[in-house]
A protein has these predicted regions:
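Positively charged n-region of N-terminal signal peptides that target proteins for export
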Residues: 1-6
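Structured extracytoplasmic
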Residues: 22-149, 161, 168-181, 194, ...
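Beta-strand-dense domains in secreted/periplasmic systems and polymorphic toxin scaffolds
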Residues: 165, 212-214
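Bacterial N-terminal signal peptides
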Residues: 7-16
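Extended lipid/amphipathic-ligand handling interfaces
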Residues: 151-156, 185-202
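RNase H-like DDE/DDD metal-dependent nuclease/strand-transfer catalytic core used by mobile genetic elements
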Residues: 208-210
């Protein structure tokens, strides 16, 4: 009997110690994003392969002179002057969106800023990753719309790094009276810009987006249909300048 009591006490004590050492969901996610390099476009050059349902665009980004894009190929051939002009105009518009301030509803500087850390719920715990659901947050005009969305992210166990982040709408809704959003899906895949794979005990640093996906199906005024699907992958990263210490 005494041995049984001791065994039970030891088991209970181990549970208490384990609970004390366990990280909260917000701590896990904050740690997973610590390695994200929010200034990666100031340091790294890379290729972008983008498919928009009509054409496949292959371009190269360089951080020189504040960020330069060069269109290399379109559908495997040399681009026309019109395609080059269209590409550069779109990239400039993208740059303006990404650098817009909070009041203009620009995207968050770091992906973690789109997560309400108080709403994290562990959905899956596998041998390789932890998958959490969350409620996303937006800025400016996007704040109200984000309340209708649901988010999901995955943290890799081998190095405690973020793997992907998704935001989607569980069901159709009207962000405005005259607009119905049937489908919204946004996904970012993250990883190291080098070819080194994550290993047990590896550190989580210099994490950048390696792929993006965006889908939207929207109807405006009951007449205009907007159906967008864009996928992009990023590769061949070259360090332009070493991060300042």
């Amino acid at each position: 009997m005494p041995n049984s009591i001791i065994t039970v006490c030891c088991f209970c004590l181990s549970l208490l110690v384990g609970s004390a050492n366990a990280q909260t969901a917000s701590e896990v996610v904050i740690e997973a994003f610590k390695g994200f390099d929010q200034d990666y476009r100031e340091k790294w050059g890379f290729d972008e392969l983008r498919e928009d349902g009509e054409k496949t665009w292959f371009g190269r980004f360089s951080p020189e002179s504040g960020g330069l894009w060069t269109l290399m190929r379109v559908d495997g051939r040399d681009p026309t002057e019109e395609e080059t002009a269209e590409y550069l105009e779109e990239k400039e518009a993208q740059r303006e969106r990404e650098t817009s301030d909070d009041e203009q509803g620009g995207p968050p500087r770091s992906p973690i800023d789109s997560i309400d850390l108080t709403t994290l719920v562990l959905e899956q715990d596998t041998s390789e990753s932890l998958v959490y659901s969350f409620l996303p947050v937006g800025r400016g005009d996007q704040a109200k719309m984000m309340k209708k969305m649901r988010g999901e992210l995955s943290v890799r166990k081998s190095d405690s790094c973020i793997e992907y982040l998704e935001i989607t709408n569980p069901k159709p809704f009207r962000p405005q009276i005259t607009v119905k959003l049937n489908r919204f899906f946004s996904r970012f895949d993250f990883g190291s810009p080098t070819s080194e794979s994550a290993a047990v005990g590896a550190t989580c640093e210099n994490i950048v987006p390696l792929g993006t996906q965006f889908e939207m199906d929207m109807k405006a005024l009951g007449l205009m249909n907007i159906d967008v699907s864009v996928r992009a992958t990023y590769s061949n990263f070259v360090l332009f300048s070493a991060p300042e210490s």
